[in-house]
Regions:
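Active-site-proximal polar cores
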Residues: 1-68, 75
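Short, conserved turn/kink motifs that form compact alpha/beta structural patches or helix kinks used as
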Residues: 43-122, 127-133, 138-147
Length: 147
């Protein structure tokens, strides 16, 4: 069945509508989180490994809990190296909100203290007040959305 000729698919006004609906959904059904960006204190110049970092800023942001694995279940595993917590959380954050409220402050950091100001980075921290838990960002979905 062909697309309806009464809608302009991909027009800027419809893209704006979809973005506004995403922001409203996050505001209504999301949770407040604290985003703690990592500042690099010391970097090994040979293999470019970050050897020391600090977290001295925090930004309040709304996020939607897309998938929660490990909450409410005994997911701590005793290994030969100690206790390993396997709690995971998948958060959905609006790119527009991040660009409006966090990116301008991240651009004020010196270039040697940050990795990227446009998106969150692996190694940054998320504080979830719902569970009083601190999570490290392990993966960022950097693909451009369809709209």
């Amino acid at each position: 069945m062909p697309l309806s000729p009464f809608f302009l698919h991909g027009s800027p006004s419809e893209q704006r509508l979809v973005q506004d609906l995403v922001n409203e959904h996050l505001t209504l059904f999301g949770q407040d989180i604290l985003y703690l960006p990592r500042k690099i204190v010391n970097r090994n110049t040979v293999i470019r490994e970050i050897t020391a970092s600090k977290f001295d800023d925090s930004f309040r942001l709304e996020a939607y809990l897309g998938n929660v694995d490990g909450f409410g279940t005994p997911s701590d595993v005793l290994t030969k190296f100690g206790v390993r917590a396997q709690d995971e959380v998948t958060l959905v954050v609006s790119k527009e909100r991040y660009d409006d409220f966090i990116s301008p402050f991240m651009k004020l950091f010196p270039a040697e203290e940050r990795l990227n100001a446009q998106t969150p980075n692996e190694g940054d921290l998320i504080y979830l007040p719902l569970d009083n838990a601190l999570f490290e960002i392990k993966y960022i979905e950097r693909k451009v959305p369809f709209y």
